[in-house]
Regions:
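Terminal, non-catalytic protein-protein interaction segments that mediate quaternary/complex assembly
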Residues: 1-242
Length: 242
């Protein structure tokens, strides 16, 4: 990531669709209406397949009619646009038992893994528990499609002063002219004034299955973008995508 963004250049890559899907995940959304409204049709086929397998009425729509109904009919979208507890649900609202519930009562609570990740990066960046998981074995049978890329982990490290100097010069190139022979203390002071990050962050994700030609380039770009977003949120520099 330090050398550039990992977007494949040997075939057409619709970056807008990649970003739209990632934002859909981060919203905690599991209904394709948001995607359809933003002209992103990555998940249309999965929702339509679920409709065909479930619908018991007299009139069965074709796929184009189905997508149009999702876009224009809120009640239809609410009923048929859901994919079950897929990525967004697990990332932002993983359901679990509430251990603070009164005795003999069964309460549920949601765990926001993304918020927890951001919090832990700010408070304990050297932790080896900086993970997000979408493989909820208790809900796999409710998902239209179980997660292919099912989890990711982030790692951070301290940046050396030399690395921070390189970043500072990119932020404000004129510094190289005026501070080229500056002392170490002077450079540290300038880096602090410019709010140059002190740490770099890397991300590693896991997949159980992938369409190498079609899906993998999307996954690489999506997790690259996610790393950029997380790094921005915690004032770190994107380092390695693994």
């Amino acid at each position: 990531m330090l050398d550039g963004f990992p977007l494949l250049t040997t075939k057409k890559m619709p970056f807008r669709l990649i970003a739209t899907e990632l934002l859909w995940f981060l919203r905690g959304d599991t209904n394709i209406k948001y995607l359809v409204d933003n002209d992103c049709h990555i998940w249309d086929g999965d929702a339509f397949k679920n409709y065909l397998n479930t619908y018991k009425g007299n009139f069965e729509m074709d796929k184009d009619e189905f997508v149009e109904a999702i876009k224009t009919n809120p009640e239809f979208a609410k009923k048929w646009g859901s994919l079950g507890p897929v990525y967004g649900r697990q990332w932002r609202n993983w359901e679990t038992d509430d251990t603070d519930a009164p005795r003999y009562e069964h309460w549920k609570k949601d765990i926001d893994q993304i918020s927890n990740l951001i919090r832990d990066l700010k408070t304990n960046p050297d932790s080896r528990r900086l993970m997000v998981n979408a493989w909820n074995v208790g809900e796999l049978d409710q998902m239209t499609l179980p997660p292919c890329h099912y989890g990711f982990q982030v790692y951070t490290r301290e940046l050396s002063l030399e690395e921070r100097k390189v970043i500072a010069k990119k932020v404000l190139p004129i510094l190289n002219t005026f501070l080229g022979n500056q002392s170490e203390e002077g450079w540290i002071e300038q880096c602090e004034k410019l709010n140059i990050p002190t740490r770099a962050i890397s991300l590693m994700w896991n997949q159980r299955s992938v369409d190498t030609f079609l899906g993998l380039p999307f996954n690489i770009a999506s997790y690259g973008l996610l790393l950029e977003i997380i790094a921005k949120a915690v004032n770190m520099i994107p380092d390695e995508l693994i």
